[in-house]
Amino acid sequence: MASRYVAVGMMLSQTVVGVLGSFSLLLHYLSLHYIGCRLRSADLIVKHLIAASFLTLLCKGVPQTMAAFRVRYFLNAIGCKLVFYLHRVGRGVSTGTTCLLSVFQVITVSSRKSRWAKLKEKAPKHVGFSVLLCWILCMLVNIIFPIYVTGKRNHTNITVNKDLGDCCGRGNNKIAQTLRAMLLSFPDVLCLGFMLWASSSMVCILHRHKQRVQHIHRSNLSPRASPENRATQSILIPVSTFVSSYTLSCLLQVCMALLDNPNSLLVNTSALMSACFPTLSPFVLMSCDPSVYRLCFAWKR
């Protein structure tokens, strides 16, 4: 009984904090538009990341909280299909836009003499198309979920279905479950690889730039960190947060796919880890965005 209340409290807290963070970041961009600041091309990616995080939190947090409260049959078959599908799409777009943001940043910070010189000028023009393509691909890849998931009120024979809280998954074929888990994990693994490559490339570029201007920093007596160090922190903090949370989430998702009837602890832990990055990402992005501090000074003036 106590563990159920702990699960309810954690899910509610995570959902509320994540939604408030998403609204705060959205309000931040609206405030920048209000005071006349020109938004960057990367801000469009961040806006879609906010939308995907918000979608993930609502579609995972609310049903899991209702299931933890033991509200039976909160969702019917159509509701289960829609909620699981939107959650997977939001999760995929969150992964894809974070990866896209990392790749866009490495193209932006690269020098004009590098092999990314041609992409440096074209990249801002194709940000919108890239984000739209990310949404379309996630919708197509996760189309299997409306076929696989259904509501418990429509299927009382739980022995042939996988328990997913208020919903259930059809079938218990081990081979099909393994293939499905590999198919759904492949885009996440691919995005993680691109993200690690982009982040390491950016850190190397900033380190080389710092070495070139080392004599300038030696003459600067200010105790503040160099711009390269601050930029490196703004790169590594979001990526490390994403990689750690989504790696654990992917492992738990694979375990749930391979088990016939995962217990409530595994289901609740997987739900918490799935919403971990969407909850933290608005605060991480705001802490690493210098425009937040410019906005604060603008309001003070």
UniProtKB/Swiss-Prot annotation:
Residues 37-48, 108-126, 207-234, 286-301 are cytoplasmic. It is found in: Cell membrane. Its main location: membrane. One of its GO terms (molecular function) is pheromone receptor activity. GO terms for cellular component: plasma membrane. Glycans are attached at N154, N157. Residues 1-15, 70-88, 148-185, 256-264 are extracellular. It is a multi-pass membrane protein. The chain crosses the membrane at residues 16-36, 49-69, 89-107, 127-147, 186-206, 235-255, 265-285. Pfam families: V1R. GO terms for biological process: response to pheromone; sensory perception of chemical stimulus. Keywords: Cell membrane, G-protein coupled receptor, Glycoprotein, Membrane, Pheromone response, Receptor, Transducer, Transmembrane, Transmembrane helix. Belongs to the G-protein coupled receptor 1 family. Putative pheromone receptor. This is Vomeronasal type-1 receptor 4. The gene is VN1R4.
